[in-house]
Amino acid sequence: MMAAGPRTSLLLAFALLCLPWTQVVGAFPAMSLSGLFANAVLRAQHLHQLAADTFKEFERTYIPEGQRYTIQNTQVAFCFSETIPAPTGKNEAQQKSDLELLRISLLLNQSWLGPLQFLSRVFTNSLVFGTSDRVYEKLKDLEEGILALMRELEDGTPRAGQILKQTYDKFDTNMRSDDALLKNYGLLSCFRKDLHKTETYLRVMKCRRFGEASCAF
């Protein structure tokens, strides 16, 4: 039988994950900075997993196995986020300040709000794709969490960040077109990569500030 302590912690984490940031911050104005970081990491981790699952399901359903490697090494797999000076891994992220990482995370997050707003109209035929109507809502929720952290660290309203010179296109609803399939495949690949970056940055910040035993990742 699971001990009461771990069970309570899991239930609390799940409850916080289900709360919108406005409730978390509004209902618990004295919430610690570590709590805000813990929430942000949970939400980013959940979104990253959802992005990875959706990508794998799309790949399995629409992209022949023999074509996957070739496609991933072509221009269709280029991500606009690569045009900004974002760290590519944990070691590079360690060289950036917390505010720099938060601004980059916010930029990555906001670059997907437009394309993902109507994602559910594209993917409707599986259990994984069936969750896509909630991705936009979860992304907006993570945006609020990042802004809340920036307000805490800046002790005020976050300054406007850099704007991507290019943004992601919307997903193509014409799934019978090869061009549309390749476009959507590339977008899902970029979404997965960008969410991995965001999760990595948030985890680096949380571990750096609070030195937890679980910082190895």
Swiss-Prot record:
Chain's gene name: GH1
Function: Plays an important role in growth control. Its major role in stimulating body growth is to stimulate the liver and other tissues to secrete IGF1. It stimulates both the differentiation and proliferation of myoblasts. It also stimulates amino acid uptake and protein synthesis in muscle and other tissues.
Disulfide cysteine pairs (residue numbers): C79-C190, C207-C215
PANTHER family membership: SOMATOTROPIN (PTHR11417:SF2), SOMATOTROPIN,PROLACTIN (PTHR11417)
Gene Ontology cellular-component terms listed: extracellular space
Annotated positions binding Zn(2+): H46, E199
Subcellular location: Secreted
UniProt modified residues of type Phosphoserine: S132
Family assignment from sequence similarity: Belongs to the somatotropin/prolactin family.
Entry protein name: Somatotropin
Superkingdom: Eukaryota
Keyword Manganese among UniProt keywords: no
GO molecular-function term, one example from the UniProt record: hormone activity
PROSITE patterns: SOMATOTROPIN_1 (PS00266), SOMATOTROPIN_2 (PS00338)
